[in-house]
């Protein structure tokens, strides 16, 4: 079983990414998936996932989704004091046998990271609508995440974001750690994303090459 932490600023596409990867892992790889969401003041993301993946697509049983309302700084619940998320993990694992558990952080800044006792693998999500400056600015989330996902590349021409600049800056900041440029709306770059995720799952012994 692998715990995948997904974090990034508000509106970058974290929930959409989790929904996409869950559909892929369940339908294409035959894996069992659980999801924990963190929101500051509501369970909006958990409700959305429940409506889309449980009710509409029928990909997950309802007991595989847990929503947490943190009521404070989003990073506290995933880093400084992850106890509420650890309890949610324990609850999920008692309910059913799972291969992958996604833990979605509440929207936060580029300094956010997951505690290593909470997540085995981390994905930081940026989007081009926020501009092309973020990879170059660094921050622990961008630097230390196992995978950096730059989402909404279809919007780059409309917001003046230079994708090549973002690519160069990411390579400089992240060294040999992977970065993928995707659009979850158009499907651009999705093959690269899946290749990286599959590679990690192969290392964990969850799927075969």
Curated annotation (Swiss-Prot):
UniProt-annotated location(s): Cytoplasm
UniProt cross-references to SUPFAM superfamilies, sorted A to Z: P-loop containing nucleoside triphosphate hydrolases (SSF52540)
Single Gene Ontology BP annotation: urea catabolic process
Family membership noted in the UniProt record: Belongs to the SIMIBI class G3E GTPase family. UreG subfamily.
InterPro entries: CobW/HypB/UreG_nucleotide-bd, P-loop_NTPase, UreG
Keywords from the named record: Chaperone, Cytoplasm, GTP-binding, Nickel insertion, Nucleotide-binding
Quaternary structure (record): Homodimer. UreD, UreF and UreG form a complex that acts as a GTP-hydrolysis-dependent molecular chaperone, activating the urease apoprotein by helping to assemble the nickel containing metallocenter of UreC. The UreE protein probably delivers the nickel.
Protein name: Urease accessory protein UreG
Described function: Facilitates the functional incorporation of the urease nickel metallocenter. This process requires GTP hydrolysis, probably effectuated by UreG.
Entry GO terms, CC: cytoplasm
Keyword presence, Cytoplasm: yes
Pfam families (UniProt xref): cobW (PF02492)
Gene3D superfamilies to which the protein is assigned, alphabetical: P-loop containing nucleotide triphosphate hydrolases
GO terms, molecular function: GTP binding; GTPase activity; nickel cation binding
Chain residues that bind GTP: 8-15
Lineage start: Archaea, Thermoproteota, Thermoprotei, Sulfolobales, Sulfolobaceae
């Amino acid at each position: 079983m692998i715990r995948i932490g997904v974090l990034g600023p508000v509106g970058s596409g974290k929930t959409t990414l989790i929904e996409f990867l869950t559909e892929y892992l369940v339908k294409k790889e035959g894996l069992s998936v659980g999801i924990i969401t963190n929101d500051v003041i509501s369970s909006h993301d958990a409700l959305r996932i429940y409506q889309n993946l449980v009710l509409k697509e029928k990909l997950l049983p309802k007991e595989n989704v847990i929503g947490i309302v943190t009521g404070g700084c989003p990073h506290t619940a995933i880093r400084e004091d992850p106890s509420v998320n650890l309890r949610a993990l324990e609850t999920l694992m008692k309910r059913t046998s799972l291969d992958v558990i996604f833990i979605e952080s509440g929207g936060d800044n580029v300094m956010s990271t997951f505690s290593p006792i909470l997540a085995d693998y981390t994905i930081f999500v940026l989007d081009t609508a926020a501009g092309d400056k973020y990879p170059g600015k660094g921050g622990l989330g961008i630097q230390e995440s196992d995978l950096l996902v730059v989402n909404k590349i279809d919007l780059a021409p409309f917001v003046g974001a230079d994708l090549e600049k973002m690519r160069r800056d990411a390579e400089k900041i992240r060294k040999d750690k992977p970065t993928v440029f995707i659009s979850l709306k158009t499907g651009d770059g999705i093959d690269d994303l899946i290749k990286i995720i599959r590679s990690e799952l192969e290392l964990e012994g969850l799927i075969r090459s």
